[in-house]
A protein has these predicted regions:
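Conserved AdoMet/S-adenosylmethionine-binding subsite of the radical SAM
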Residues: 1-147
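Radical SAM enzyme core and accessory elements
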Residues: 177-189
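Conserved, mostly hydrophobic/aromatic
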Residues: 51, 131, 165, 173-176
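Conserved N-terminal glycine/acidic-rich loop preference
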Residues: 91-94, 100, 142-172
Protein backbone atom coordinates (compact mmCIF):
# COMPACT_ATOMS: atom_id res chain seq x y z
CA UNK A 1 0.00 0.00 0.00
CA UNK A 2 1.51 3.31 -1.05
CA UNK A 3 0.21 6.87 -0.63
CA UNK A 4 1.89 8.19 -3.78
CA UNK A 5 -1.18 8.28 -6.00
CA UNK A 6 -2.96 10.35 -3.35
CA UNK A 7 -0.10 12.77 -2.64
CA UNK A 8 -1.96 15.89 -3.75
CA UNK A 9 -5.10 14.93 -1.83
CA UNK A 10 -2.93 14.22 1.21
CA UNK A 11 -1.43 17.72 0.99
CA UNK A 12 -4.91 19.27 0.86
CA UNK A 13 -6.09 17.11 3.76
CA UNK A 14 -3.07 18.12 5.85
CA UNK A 15 -3.74 21.80 5.14
CA UNK A 16 -7.35 21.42 6.32
CA UNK A 17 -6.40 19.37 9.37
CA UNK A 18 -3.71 21.85 10.46
CA UNK A 19 -6.15 24.76 10.09
CA UNK A 20 -8.43 22.84 12.45
CA UNK A 21 -5.67 22.39 15.02
CA UNK A 22 -3.93 19.13 14.15
CA UNK A 23 -0.56 19.22 15.88
CA UNK A 24 1.04 15.79 15.55
CA UNK A 25 3.87 14.54 13.34
CA UNK A 26 2.68 13.61 9.85
CA UNK A 27 4.18 10.30 8.70
CA UNK A 28 4.57 9.27 5.05
CA UNK A 29 4.95 5.50 4.69
CA UNK A 30 6.45 4.85 1.27
CA UNK A 31 7.64 2.00 -0.92
CA UNK A 32 10.66 4.17 -1.76
CA UNK A 33 10.21 3.96 -5.53
CA UNK A 34 8.99 7.54 -5.70
CA UNK A 35 8.93 10.24 -8.34
CA UNK A 36 11.27 12.92 -7.00
CA UNK A 37 8.83 15.69 -7.97
CA UNK A 38 6.11 14.10 -5.84
CA UNK A 39 8.45 14.10 -2.84
CA UNK A 40 9.48 17.71 -3.49
CA UNK A 41 5.79 18.71 -3.50
CA UNK A 42 5.40 17.20 -0.02
CA UNK A 43 8.00 19.58 1.46
CA UNK A 44 6.65 21.29 4.55
CA UNK A 45 3.77 18.85 4.98
CA UNK A 46 5.56 15.69 6.11
CA UNK A 47 7.51 15.35 9.36
CA UNK A 48 8.59 11.70 9.20
CA UNK A 49 9.30 9.64 6.12
CA UNK A 50 9.37 5.81 6.29
CA UNK A 51 10.68 4.72 2.87
CA UNK A 52 11.50 1.15 1.93
CA UNK A 53 14.84 0.43 0.32
CA UNK A 54 14.35 -3.07 -1.04
CA UNK A 55 16.87 -3.63 -3.77
CA UNK A 56 20.46 -2.68 -4.45
CA UNK A 57 20.47 -4.82 -7.57
CA UNK A 58 18.58 -3.50 -10.58
CA UNK A 59 18.23 -7.11 -11.73
CA UNK A 60 16.33 -8.06 -8.55
CA UNK A 61 14.18 -4.93 -8.75
CA UNK A 62 13.09 -5.77 -12.26
CA UNK A 63 12.62 -9.47 -11.57
CA UNK A 64 10.58 -9.14 -8.38
CA UNK A 65 8.94 -5.71 -8.63
CA UNK A 66 9.15 -4.73 -12.29
CA UNK A 67 10.88 -1.55 -11.10
CA UNK A 68 13.69 -0.50 -13.44
CA UNK A 69 16.34 1.79 -11.96
CA UNK A 70 14.85 1.07 -8.53
CA UNK A 71 17.99 1.79 -6.51
CA UNK A 72 18.74 5.12 -8.23
CA UNK A 73 15.13 6.28 -8.02
CA UNK A 74 14.64 5.19 -4.41
CA UNK A 75 17.92 6.62 -3.13
CA UNK A 76 17.27 9.95 -4.89
CA UNK A 77 13.86 10.11 -3.22
CA UNK A 78 15.35 9.20 0.17
CA UNK A 79 18.01 11.91 -0.13
CA UNK A 80 15.27 14.45 -0.92
CA UNK A 81 13.29 13.28 2.11
CA UNK A 82 16.34 13.81 4.34
CA UNK A 83 16.95 17.22 2.77
CA UNK A 84 13.40 18.22 3.73
CA UNK A 85 13.13 16.97 7.30
CA UNK A 86 16.73 16.74 8.48
CA UNK A 87 18.21 14.38 11.04
CA UNK A 88 15.82 12.35 13.18
CA UNK A 89 14.57 13.96 16.39
CA UNK A 90 12.75 12.11 19.15
CA UNK A 91 10.54 13.26 22.02
CA UNK A 92 11.14 12.45 25.70
CA UNK A 93 9.40 9.08 25.21
CA UNK A 94 11.60 8.04 22.29
CA UNK A 95 8.88 8.70 19.69
CA UNK A 96 10.17 10.16 16.45
CA UNK A 97 9.06 13.75 15.79
CA UNK A 98 10.86 14.32 12.52
CA UNK A 99 13.33 12.56 10.26
CA UNK A 100 13.71 9.52 8.03
CA UNK A 101 13.76 5.83 8.92
CA UNK A 102 14.81 3.73 5.94
CA UNK A 103 13.28 0.25 6.06
CA UNK A 104 14.95 -2.76 4.50
CA UNK A 105 13.27 -6.15 4.22
CA UNK A 106 15.76 -9.02 4.15
CA UNK A 107 14.88 -11.53 1.42
CA UNK A 108 15.81 -15.22 1.57
CA UNK A 109 18.73 -16.20 -0.64
CA UNK A 110 19.57 -12.54 -1.28
CA UNK A 111 21.88 -11.74 1.61
CA UNK A 112 24.37 -9.89 -0.59
CA UNK A 113 21.57 -7.52 -1.63
CA UNK A 114 21.00 -6.69 2.05
CA UNK A 115 24.72 -6.27 2.71
CA UNK A 116 24.99 -3.88 -0.23
CA UNK A 117 22.06 -1.83 1.11
CA UNK A 118 23.61 -1.64 4.58
CA UNK A 119 27.01 -0.65 3.19
CA UNK A 120 25.42 2.05 1.04
CA UNK A 121 23.47 3.32 4.06
CA UNK A 122 26.66 3.50 6.16
CA UNK A 123 28.57 5.36 3.44
CA UNK A 124 25.79 7.77 2.50
CA UNK A 125 23.20 8.20 5.26
CA UNK A 126 24.83 7.37 8.61
CA UNK A 127 24.04 10.22 11.00
CA UNK A 128 21.35 11.60 8.68
CA UNK A 129 18.73 8.84 9.00
CA UNK A 130 17.97 5.62 10.84
CA UNK A 131 17.73 2.19 9.26
CA UNK A 132 15.28 -0.53 10.25
CA UNK A 133 16.22 -4.04 9.14
CA UNK A 134 13.12 -6.21 8.91
CA UNK A 135 12.78 -9.99 9.13
CA UNK A 136 9.07 -10.30 8.40
CA UNK A 137 9.27 -11.58 4.83
CA UNK A 138 7.12 -14.56 3.96
CA UNK A 139 6.15 -15.76 0.49
CA UNK A 140 2.78 -14.93 -1.00
CA UNK A 141 1.21 -15.26 -4.43
CA UNK A 142 3.82 -15.98 -7.14
CA UNK A 143 6.72 -15.85 -4.67
CA UNK A 144 5.57 -19.25 -3.45
CA UNK A 145 6.56 -20.63 -6.86
CA UNK A 146 9.99 -18.95 -6.94
CA UNK A 147 12.81 -21.25 -5.79
CA UNK A 148 14.66 -18.33 -4.18
CA UNK A 149 11.73 -16.62 -2.45
CA UNK A 150 9.43 -19.51 -1.51
CA UNK A 151 10.36 -19.49 2.19
CA UNK A 152 10.93 -17.15 5.13
CA UNK A 153 14.47 -16.09 5.92
CA UNK A 154 16.29 -18.41 8.28
CA UNK A 155 18.36 -17.80 11.42
CA UNK A 156 21.66 -18.25 9.59
CA UNK A 157 20.78 -15.61 6.99
CA UNK A 158 19.49 -13.12 9.52
CA UNK A 159 22.44 -13.70 11.83
CA UNK A 160 24.77 -12.93 8.92
CA UNK A 161 22.98 -9.62 8.32
CA UNK A 162 23.05 -8.79 12.03
CA UNK A 163 26.80 -9.45 12.19
CA UNK A 164 27.37 -7.31 9.12
CA UNK A 165 25.39 -4.44 10.67
CA UNK A 166 27.75 -4.59 13.67
CA UNK A 167 30.86 -4.88 11.48
CA UNK A 168 29.78 -1.70 9.70
CA UNK A 169 29.21 -0.10 13.12
CA UNK A 170 25.88 1.40 12.12
CA UNK A 171 24.73 3.18 15.27
CA UNK A 172 21.38 4.53 14.17
CA UNK A 173 19.46 1.41 13.38
CA UNK A 174 17.02 -1.24 14.46
CA UNK A 175 16.82 -4.96 13.81
CA UNK A 176 13.47 -6.68 13.98
CA UNK A 177 13.43 -9.89 15.99
CA UNK A 178 13.52 -13.01 13.90
CA UNK A 179 10.42 -14.51 15.41
CA UNK A 180 7.20 -15.89 14.13
CA UNK A 181 5.54 -13.38 11.85
CA UNK A 182 2.08 -14.78 11.66
CA UNK A 183 0.42 -14.66 8.30
CA UNK A 184 -2.99 -14.08 9.86
CA UNK A 185 -1.92 -10.49 10.56
CA UNK A 186 -1.44 -9.80 6.86
CA UNK A 187 -4.45 -8.69 4.79
CA UNK A 188 -5.63 -11.09 2.12
CA UNK A 189 -5.12 -8.90 -0.92
Amino acid sequence: VAPTMYAYQIIEAIKIAKKRGLNIPIIYNSNGYENIETIKNLKGYIDVYLPDLKYYSNELAIKYSKAPEYFNIATSAIKEMIEQVGCPEFDENGIIKKGVIVRHLVLPNHIQNSKNILKWFKENLEGKAYISVMAQYFPTYKAREDNLLNRKINKKEYSEIEKYLFILDIENGYMQDLGEHEEEYVPDF
